[in-house]
């Protein structure tokens, strides 16, 4: 980017989505002590990973558990990471193997999280009985995921704030087109690689309207 005089980047920090996912886990875990099924104070979790080697998948996988442990909660992984579009089939196998030992499902994206939900529901979980509930968290804040959060079947997701990303692109473009400095009169800042980083937003039922507003 530095080699181009008139080029800037608007986007996010991949690791932040994992941190925000971890924030949701910490907040909801502390608010729901019954989720600690064996009472050991440790989150026994499974994780559905995206494409191996992809920066977003790697960052989300690393940072979700890093954030949780840095906030005083121990974790124990019950599975190897999986790259799969067949999330339901994989979670079916995990449920059969681990059953009620699974206390949380972390997913690198919402599509796989919804596949996990299909799996647990087919086995009697997440259907309104609080004693048979496995919390699930994803990333992307797609409409189907938001609907499940409102139903109470999914705990949360992470919004990539496309609305504010678009605003940043427009603001910088208009300034440059009018011969101004790219940031003049805007709320944005540039990092050391000429990038505007728009923060991710953790989404739960408490602030779901924030995500829904991006689709209006």
Model-derived segments and spans:
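Short, solvent-exposed amphipathic alpha-helices that sit
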Residues: 17-24, 55-73, 90, 115-119
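Loop/turn elements at helix/coil->beta-strand transitions in domains of secreted/extracellular proteins
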Residues: 4-6, 42-44, 69-75, 99-103, ...
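Solvent-exposed loop/turn segments at secondary-structure junctions
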Residues: 1-3, 15-16, 51-55, 81-85, ...
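Hinge/cleft segment of the Venus flytrap/periplasmic-binding protein
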Residues: 41-52, 56, 67-68, 166-216
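Extracellular/periplasmic ligand-binding modules, especially the Venus flytrap/periplasmic-binding
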Residues: 108-117, 150, 160-178
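Short, hydrophobic alpha-helical segments
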Residues: 25-33, 95, 170-181
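Flexible loop/hinge segments that line or gate small-molecule binding clefts
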Residues: 1-23, 27, 32-44, 142-150, ...
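Hydrophobic alpha-helical
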Residues: 64, 76-148
């Amino acid at each position: 980017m530095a080699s181009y005089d008139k080029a800037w980047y608007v986007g996010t920090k991949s690791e932040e989505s994992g941190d925000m996912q971890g924030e949701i886990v910490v907040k909801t875990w502390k608010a729901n002590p019954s989720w600690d099924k064996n009472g050991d104070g440790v989150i026994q979790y499974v994780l559905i990973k995206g494409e191996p080697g992809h920066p977003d998948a790697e960052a989300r996988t690393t940072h979700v558990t890093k954030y949780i442990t840095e906030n005083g909660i121990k974790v124990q992984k019950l599975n190897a990471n999986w790259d799969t579009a067949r999330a339901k089939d994989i979670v079916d196998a995990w449920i059969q193997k681990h059953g009620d030992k699974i206390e949380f499902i972390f997913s690198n994206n919402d599509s796989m999280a919804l596949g996990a939900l299909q799996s647990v529901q087919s086995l009697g979980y997440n259907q309104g009985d609080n004693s048979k509930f496995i919390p699930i968290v994803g990333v992307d804040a797609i409409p189907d995921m938001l609907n499940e959060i409102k139903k109470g079947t999914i705990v949360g997701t992470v919004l990539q704030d496309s609305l504010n990303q678009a605003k940043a692109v427009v603001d910088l473009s208009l300034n440059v087109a009018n011969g101004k400095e790219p940031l003049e009169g805007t709320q944005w800042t540039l990092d050391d690689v000429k990038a505007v980083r728009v923060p991710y937003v953790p989404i739960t039922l408490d602030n779901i309207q924030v995500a829904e507003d991006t689709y209006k």
